[in-house]
A protein has these predicted regions:
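Short, charged beta-turn/beta-strand-edge "cap" motif at the junction between a beta-strand
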Residues: 166-176, 183-184
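Short nucleic-acid-contacting surface segments enriched for D/E, G, S/T with interspersed K/R
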Residues: 149-166
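General N-terminal leader/first-domain-start detector
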Residues: 1-62
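Short aromatic-glycine-enriched beta-strand elements
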Residues: 130-135
Length: 241
């Protein structure tokens, strides 16, 4: 299993945090452009999913300007809730195709960042408050750093929870730093259908090599994990409210 230095150098953490804040605000603003058509889609399932995420069902991270940029969730919808062969090119792909060679430097940068998006399942290992969370990427089977200021205050070491999310890499590749795409969906122990429970067992115990998914398999895995996470959150809300 690959390891990470856990950003021991304070100067490195300062650089990573500044880049995280810049890039997060930039992607949130730009992605809003592709979220709007989804809200008015003729596809009922897509429209319902877009409204559910857009209206804040998932936990949101606050920004310095006081806004919650719900539109980031389009990156998650791309893999978790869209079937591209039925709906057409995904919003992420449309953005990349439209702005990948744009004269607008910011739009071009966002398109480049989006092109490296990937879905995964994370297990938190250790929190560094005010910066982020050291996690095990269960699909890549390696440690990584999730730069997440808000999350760093709430994760509990050894809690055993698994989170489904999308990741965007940034900064020096050797740092193995990522930011999530706006939602960390919890998969708690109290609600795990057999298929996902077995998936987690396979990832954590029996596999000795990283799990490699074909492009057409990623949406299936993401859809299962996110459906499970959404239903689990709903169950928790019903049970404990």
């Amino acid at each position: 299993m690959a390891s990470t230095s856990w950003m021991k150098n304070k100067d490195d953490r300062t650089v990573a945090l500044a880049e995280y804040q810049r890039l997060r605000a930039l992607t949130a603003r730009e992605v809003a452009e592709v979220m709007q058509p989804m809200l008015g889609s003729d596809n009922a399932a897509l429209k319902s999913a877009a409204h559910r995420l857009y209206n804040g069902v998932t936990p949101r991270e606050g920004y310095e300007d006081g806004e919650n940029h719900e539109a980031e969730n389009t990156l998650i919808l791309d893999y978790a809730l869209l079937l591209n062969d039925r709906v057409g090119p995904s919003p992420r792909r449309q953005y990349i195709d439209k702005y990948g060679a744009s004269d607008d430097a910011e739009k071009r940068e966002v398109a480049e960042v989006m092109s490296h998006y990937r879905f995964t399942l994370l297990r938190p290992v250790r929190s560094r408050k005010g910066f982020g969370v050291k996690c095990v990427d269960l699909l890549a089977q390696q440690e990584m750093v999730l730069v997440d200021v808000a999350g760093s205050e709430h994760f509990h070491e050894g809690c055993g929870e698994v989170y489904a999310t999308g990741l965007l890499p940034f900064c020096d590749p050797s740092w193995n730093c990522f930011m999530d795409t706006g939602a960390l969906m919890t998969i708690p122990d109290i609600f795990r259908p057999n298929d996902v429970a077995q998936l987690l067992v396979d990832l954590e115990v029996t596999r000795r090599q990283p799990l490699v998914l074909a492009e057409n398999e990623q949406p299936k895995l993401a859809a299962v994990a996110f459906k499970l996470a959404y239903e689990a959150q709903t169950l928790c809300q019903m049970r404990y409210r």
